[in-house]
UniProtKB/Swiss-Prot annotation:
Role noted for this protein: Exhibits ester hydrolase activity on the substrate p-nitrophenyl acetate, in vitro. Regulates DNA damage and repair by regulating HIF1A degradation via chaperone-mediated autophagy (CMA).
Protein name: Ester hydrolase C11orf54
Pfam family, one: DUF1907
MF terms (GO), sorted A to Z: hydrolase activity, acting on ester bonds; zinc ion binding
CDD domains membership: DUF1907
Matches recorded under InterPro entries: C11orf54_DUF1907
PANTHER family noted in UniProt: ESTER HYDROLASE C11ORF54 (PTHR13204:SF1), PTD012 PROTEIN (PTHR13204)
Intrachain S-S bonds: none
Primary localization: nucleus
GO CC terms: cytoplasm; extracellular exosome; nuclear body; nucleoplasm; nucleus
Source organism of the structure: Homo sapiens
Enzyme's top EC category: hydrolase
Subcellular compartments: Nucleus; Cytoplasm
Length: 315
């Protein structure tokens, strides 16, 4: 599998916190960005298999939307234990957003990878979730992947943030009451793009939507048999929902594409109340509250980049 490597620009956490504080103020009424110790992510509401997101941080973009649209390429299946080795971090803790492994589940779904990959010393732990459309009523069904299957796969496309899963210093972002047009992730990404320009910065981590509701989507269980050639056609195919807090989100974003046909931002989420999917934006700006923990990635790994590409379905 082809794999290209790129070194991100990595400012200090203090510098990033200052830049993000300033940019988020344009879009949220109350903003507080600081450098803190990473909270214990094995605890509620995260319940990750590791305590933190620190150590040898990297972003991997695997496959891409052109393997899903206009028509699916069903050969594109990836093993996250192998991806960890590909990004030179066996045993990596991986989180992010991707497409569910249809070949084992038997249907298409939104995938929320939360995986401690295998190392010489430890077996892998799969804390991932997947969300699919309930055939009975068109609602959302959110399930723990390990309760259905025992592999470590995903399919078609994935945006992943990987680290050693260690405790350490992180950037904490608190943002309340949205006053501007941008969603939480886009605001952070565009802030970094404006400030750092042609020095690309990659970020990942986790955030909680503590109050409010969000617009989300889930892909249908069946891939489209007729080509989806525009965003309008894609939106007719997707199932859209409004989902309520609290939601645990797994964002991966890059300030500027250094020439690898990247999806600049991608965020999936899960919850304890059976809702999960792909995050678009909050629908309750007056009451929304975000609390996040982020780190810059040292490296980008672009794995199995599609040779033929397009810009459909990147939202």
């Amino acid at each position: 599998m082809a794999c290209a490597e790129f070194s991100f620009h990595v400012p200090s956490l203090e510098e990033l916190a200052g830049v993000m504080q300033k940019g988020l103020k344009d879009n949220f009424a109350d903003v507080q960005v600081s450098v803190v110790d990473c909270p214990d992510l094995t605890k509620e509401p995260f319940t990750f298999p590791v305590k933190g997101i620190c150590g040898k941080t990297r972003i991997a973009e695997v496959g891409g939307v052109p393997y899903l649209l206009p028509l699916v390429n069903q050969k594109k299946v990836y093993d996250l234990n192998k991806i960890a080795k590909e990004i030179k971090l066996p045993g990596a803790f991986i989180l992010g957003a991707g497409a569910g492994p249809f070949q084992t589940l038997g249907f298409n779904s939104e995938f929320m990878p939360v995986i401690q990959t295998e190392s010489e010393h430890k077996p892998p732990v799969n804390g991932s979730y997947f969300a699919h459309v309930n055939p009975a009523d068109g609602g959302c069904l959110l399930e723990k992947y390990s309760e259905k299957c025992h592999d470590f796969q995903c399919a078609l496309l994935a945006n992943l943030f990987a680290s050693e899963g260690q405790p350490g210093k992180v950037i904490e972002v608190k943002a309340k009451r949205r006053t501007g047009p941008l969603n939480f992730v886009t605001c952070m990404r565009e802030t970094l793009e404006k400030h750092y320009g042609n020095k690309p910065i990659g970020m990942g981590g986790t955030f909680i939507i503590q109050k409010g509701k969000v617009k989300s989507h889930i892909m249908p269980a069946e891939f489209s048999s007729c080509p989806l050639n525009s965003d309008e056609e894609v939106n007719k195919w997707l199932h859209f929902y409004e989902m309520k807090a609290p939601l645990v989100c797994l964002p991966v974003f890059v300030s500027r594409d250094p020439g690898f046909d990247l999806r600049l931002e991608h965020t999936h989420f899960f919850s304890r109340h059976g809702e999960g999917g792909h995050y678009h934006y909050d629908t309750t700006p007056d009451i929304v509250e975000y609390l996040g923990y982020f780190l810059p990635a040292e490296f980008l790994y672009r794995i199995d980049q599609p040779k033929e590409t397009h810009s459909i379905g990147r939202d």
